[in-house]
């Protein structure tokens, strides 16, 4: 948790002692991300924290996801990549964790996936997705691919929570 500074610093020091130099922090906007906390941990421990930008899934979206355009949502992500997060010098290095609901991609989730694709196409940053109970991974990839994303730059999260080896192999074949 991002409220346990001493504990996290010790964990990062332990990782550094094992040769780890980079960690990816997948807590995105409106899910408790704390850019200054990450910067403080980086400065204290020397580890590099790769922060993310994006929106999680429909049930967790802030209201403005419904009212802003795809282009505006994409620009917010690009700004966090190019300019920094929450007024800090910490810049997002990955577009994540872009999620879908169990068994469906809602219209707002589709909007966010398209915005993530636009941000990826503009910045080249990789995308990491969230599947709910291993559903919709293939559909996520199809949506991203339809909007010009190089699928070798995408990871599909939590796709192994059900016995669906055929789907996993299909996703691997896509990139």
Protein language model annotation of sequence segments:
Residues 24-26, 50-52, 156-158:
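Active-site neighborhood of phospho(di)ester-bond hydrolases with catalytic His/Asp-centered motifs
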